Amino acid sequence: MHDHPDQEVPRRLEELPSFGGDIHVYHSAVATFYAPSDLCGTGGLRRELIRLTPSFYGHERRDTVFVVLDDSKDGMEGMEIGRVLLFFSFRYRRRDFSCALINWLVRDEEPDPDTGMWTVRLECDQRGQPTVEVIDLDTIARGAHLLPVYGSSKVPDNFSYHDALDSYNSFFVNHFIDHHAHEFITAS
């Protein structure tokens, strides 16, 4: 799916483009999207804040997002999930670039037969390290709500939801969080 691990990298630093400008870092981004069954607001347009903060109520917060990879495909067939590590922008050759650094979460081939929800897990490279990629901010459609696949063991009493994305191996993509998410994810 992602060709970045196999992509040929220039052998010498001199072959890379030179950049000496400023890089601006942000702790949030706003996703604006059309929710066809929600005509409140401006003709069905909705806004959603995607957070990436070092301290949100005393804990780090790194939201997950839907990344559109192929807009010719419906629902999850054309998207993947990413966990935002960094929002940043820069200017290069008189052009502005707004980007996000993300960890990819790859989905299973089919939704879970018991819940009807897609499941995702952190994508890792050949060494077991999470993959990261810089993407254009415009490819982020909206925030994604993930639920841990708990398994059969008991969740510890002192477990905090702040640690869920770092503590579980796989997650359900919750299309029941709101009616737009349901339409958006299950579109066919």
PLM segments and residue spans:
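Terminal interaction-prone segments of large eukaryotic proteins
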Residues: 1-188
